[in-house]
Amino acid sequence: MKTSDFNYELPEELIANYPLEKRNSSRLLVHLDEIEHKSFKDVLDYFEEGDLLVVNNTSVIPARIYGHKESGGSVEVMLERVLENNKALVQIRSGRAPRIGAVIIFDTFKLKCIDRQDNFFIVQFDRPPLEVFNEIGHVPLPPYIKRPDEDLDKDRYATVYEDRELQDSVAAPTAGLHFDDDLLNAIKKIGVKMARVNLSVGAGTFQPVKVENIEEHDIHSEYLEVSADVVDMVNATKEAGKKVFAV
C-alpha cells in the first residue's frame, strides 16, 4: 500500500482556524447505506436506548514551550511524555538539531539535552516538567491551524468530559471536541450509557508518514487504559444487539 494512494486536494480555505461558537454546530458526515451531510447535533438521531457511548477522558497539557540556544537561536520544545527524575521525552525544533549536552535557555530556567531517541530528545529539567509546562506552556494546536494559540484554546481544545487531573496528552482527542453538555445530556436521556477509557495522545500524532510504502512506517506508540468494567459494558451492549459508539 502506497502513501500516494491517499493523496487528495484539501483547499486551505476549508481548514477552520477557529472553532464555531457552539461545539455541536460542526459538520457531520454520515456513511451508512448512503452518504449524508449533517450538523453534529444530529448525531442524536443515531442513538437508541441501550446503546453505549465510549469516550476518551484524557486531558491536554500546555505542551509547547519556547526558548533559545546559548548561541541565541530560537528553539521550540514539544513534550511527548514525562519521565522519572525530572526528565522528559520531547521534540525539539530549531534551525539545527541540538547536540547532546546542549543547554536550552528559558526566562526562569534551563534544560539540558542528555540523550536522543530517533526524532525525540531526552532532556533534564531542574524541577518537575509538568510544573514548567503548566507555568509557561502553550496549547499545542496542530500544525494545520495557522495561528498562535489564544486563551480560548484552553477551553475549546479540550473535551467537556476530560479528567483535568490526568494531564497526559499533548494533543486533543479531536473527535470528542464536538460534544457539549447539552448534547451529552440529551443522549443520556434516551437511555444511552457512557463509558470512559484513557488514551494518552502523544506528539507522534503530528509526525508525517515519510515513506512511500506504508508497511515501512514506524508508527509511534501511545498509552491506553481500558478498565474491566468498561470491557464488560462493551461486551454486554454487543450481546444485547445494541450499538457501541467509540469516540
Regions found by a protein language model. Give the residues of each.
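Surface-exposed, charge/polar-rich loops and edge strands
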Residues: 1-247
